């Protein structure tokens, strides 16, 4: 399962092996995490300040530097949270012009994880997935559920069985399938990894 993209590919942090654009998060050979390796020369001529400023008021204005296929930006306006001047903190640390990004107002679920999920689900659509899943203790679950519902993708969320209901209320509101697993987050995450299909299957 692959799609062509000249701007980036996945590369293993440890062994250096490259995997093109596949739905992988870890190297199948050495199990090290994968990172996105960009061909900056491929975007240098087309990615300008003017083009950024003319783009939509969300993360998709930076699409040329996001690991998503061209033309696959969802219409959900994620990101573009405000910068707030932090005068008091700036005075304490000697920075007169200090601004802090306020991600407490990130659309749609008030979490910085909305940006990551938007990019992940854009790729899920490009690969043709009809169901996405994650392990979570709250914010990631809500973001995956909300954005999957918007895109018409099924979502299956694995959480620790003793997680407080308030943390995943929105997950249920958005219609995700919730699976409670006995154990802590690490155990839940391992369950997700073991049950996820391999792209080589």
Predicted regions and their residues:
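PLP-dependent amino-acid enzyme catalytic core
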Residues: 1-196, 200
């Amino acid at each position: 399962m692959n799609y062509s993209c000249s701007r980036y590919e996945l590369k293993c942090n440890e062994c250096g092996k490259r995997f093109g654009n596949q739905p992988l998060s870890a190297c199948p050979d050495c199990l090290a995490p994968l990172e996105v390796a960009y061909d900056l020369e491929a975007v240098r001529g087309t990615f300008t300040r003017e083009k950024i400023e003319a783009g939509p008021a969300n993360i998709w204005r930076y699409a040329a530097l996001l690991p998503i296929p061209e033309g696959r930006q969802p219409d959900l306006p994620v990101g573009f949270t405000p910068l707030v001047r932090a005068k008091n903190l700036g005075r304490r640390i000697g920075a007169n012009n200090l601004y802090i990004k306020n991600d407490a107002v990130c659309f749609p679920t008030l979490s910085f994880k909305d940006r990551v999920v938007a990019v992940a689900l854009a790729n899920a659509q490009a690969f043709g997935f009809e169901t996405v899943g994650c392990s979570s203790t709250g914010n990631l679950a809500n973001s995956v559920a909300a954005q999957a519902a918007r895109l018409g993708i099924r979502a299956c969320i694995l959480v620790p069985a003793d997680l407080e209901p308030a943390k995943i209320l929105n997950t249920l509101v958005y219609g995700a399938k919730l699976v409670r697993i006995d154990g802590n987050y690490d155990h839940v995450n391992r369950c997700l990894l073991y049950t996820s299909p391999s792209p080589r299957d």
